[in-house]
């Protein structure tokens, strides 16, 4: 009987031991989750500390945010966590994006307003946050845009990328290459994206597309004496009666009309008289898409509200 009791005790011990072994993976998983959570919190705190250092503020610093005086650090931490919960990016990544904006000299209000735009651009274009931040801040600076306008531009870039043969990243490169020259375009960023989309459909994209479009605009704005005489003869005017640049579609459309009935050789001679020879392929691509084709694409890009979030 004593031996039977001993056998039963050993059996019970083996079962308890087996339960313990089965619980080990569960315990390890729970411990792992705890460790990951601690690391995530530590990463977030480190990222926010970097934002604080870049902005040169103390933990007690106050800022005016949407008309209210708030603790700067607490407000930015709350924003990073909110964006981390609402987007595909973690709170730490959102804090990193904040730091890129702080490096560009943005204050609390501008960071608060611009961060969602940067995150939308990064997600829509599948690009890293550093590049997205640079694109937004550089474009706002070059084109003299306000935050709301930057949000519209990102939507337009996303719409252009989804309807023409280019990407958000390539459009960003093109826009930054054109820079302040694009300020004078009548149709703003919608017309800019339309022209870049047309060029992209013809294999001219990225910085290359931006360079050619910039050259085309400059050639129309400041023509040589020979080019000016040629344009006048054809009835092509770059500026309206008030001295503002007309739309590219209208200018190039008038050039097409002026060359109507000419041979291909005659047309190319005229185009070469007005534009740089290195830009002729781009000019011909734009000329081939004036009128309704241009208007239709530009309208779809203009009506692109929320396109970045949809992508």
Which residues does each predicted region cover?
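Extended hydrophobic/Leu-rich segments
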Residues: 2-5, 9, 65, 267, ...
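Membrane-penetrating hydrophobic segments
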Residues: 3-27
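Juxtamembrane loop-helix boundary motifs flanking transmembrane segments in multi-pass membrane proteins
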Residues: 4, 8-11, 149, 170, ...
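Small-residue helix-packing and pore-constriction motifs in hydrophobic alpha-helices
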Residues: 25-84, 93-104, 111-124, 131-163, ...
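Flexible, active-site-adjacent loop/turn segments at secondary-structure boundaries
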Residues: 42, 127, 166, 218, ...
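Hydrophobic, often aromatic-rich secondary-structure segments at membrane interfaces
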Residues: 81, 239, 246, 250-311
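N-terminal glycine-rich anion-binding loops that anchor highly charged ligand groups
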Residues: 87
């Amino acid at each position: 009987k004593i031996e039977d009791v001993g056998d039963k005790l050993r059996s019970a011990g083996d079962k308890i031991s087996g339960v313990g072994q089965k619980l080990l993976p569960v315990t390890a998983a729970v411990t792992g989750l705890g460790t990951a959570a601690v690391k995530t919190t530590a990463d977030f705190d480190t990222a926010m500390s970097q934002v604080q250092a870049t902005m040169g503020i103390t933990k007690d610093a106050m800022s005016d945010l949407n008309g209210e005086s708030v603790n700067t650090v607490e407000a930015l931490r709350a924003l990073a966590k909110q964006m981390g919960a609402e987007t595909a990016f973690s709170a730490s990544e959102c804090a990193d994006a904040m730091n890129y904006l702080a490096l560009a000299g943005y204050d609390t209000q501008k960071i608060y307003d611009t961060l969602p735009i940067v995150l939308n651009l990064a997600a829509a274009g599948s690009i890293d946050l550093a590049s997205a931040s640079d694109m937004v801040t550089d474009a706002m600076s070059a084109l003299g845009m306000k935050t709301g306008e930057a949000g519209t531009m990102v939507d337009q870039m996303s719409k252009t990328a989804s309807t023409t043969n280019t990407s958000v990243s390539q459009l960003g490169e093109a826009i930054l290459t054109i820079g302040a020259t694009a300020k004078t375009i009548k149709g703003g960023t919608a017309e800019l994206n339309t022209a870049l989309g047309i060029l992209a459909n013809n294999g001219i994209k990225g910085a290359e597309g931006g360079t050619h479009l910039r050259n085309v605009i400059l050639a129309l704005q400041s023509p040589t004496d020979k080019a000016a005489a040629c344009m006048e003869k054809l009835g092509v005017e770059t500026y309206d009666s008030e001295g503002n640049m007309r739309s590219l579609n209208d200018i190039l459309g008038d050039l097409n009309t002026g060359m109507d009935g000419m041979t291909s050789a005659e047309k190319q001679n005229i185009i070469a008289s007005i534009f740089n020879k290195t830009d002729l392929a781009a000019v011909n691509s734009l000329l081939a898409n004036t009128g309704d084709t241009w208007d239709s694409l530009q309208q779809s890009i203009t009506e692109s509200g929320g396109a970045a979030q949809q992508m």
